[in-house]
């Protein structure tokens, strides 16, 4: 089983914050953005978003460019390569 699959099972399917992290990843797949714009886009508290962004970045599912408030987040190449697997895991058909 691939490392990405293990990470996704743990971070998306096997943890309390999986639904929030799924929303973050699918939104970032559409368009890279900063935490503030992301919190507005998915209607969630900024601190909640930054908490989940930190977890996703620590696990190399997203990357960031810049620093502090203007820091832009994008899905990682690692996740991009396995995005079809991610969609299957969350029940998507795209």
Q: Where is each model-derived feature located?
A:
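Short alpha-helical segments that sit at the start of domains
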Residues: 1-23
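Short, Lys/Arg-rich nucleic-acid/phosphate-binding segment
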Residues: 66-72
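A short acidic, leucine-rich amphipathic alpha-helix
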Residues: 37-41
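Conserved segment of winged-helix/HTH DNA-binding domains
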Residues: 3, 8-9, 72-94
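Glycine-centered, phosphate/nucleic-acid-interacting loop/turn motifs that mediate DNA/RNA or nucleotide
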Residues: 60
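Short capping segments at the starts of secondary-structure elements
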Residues: 17-19, 30-34
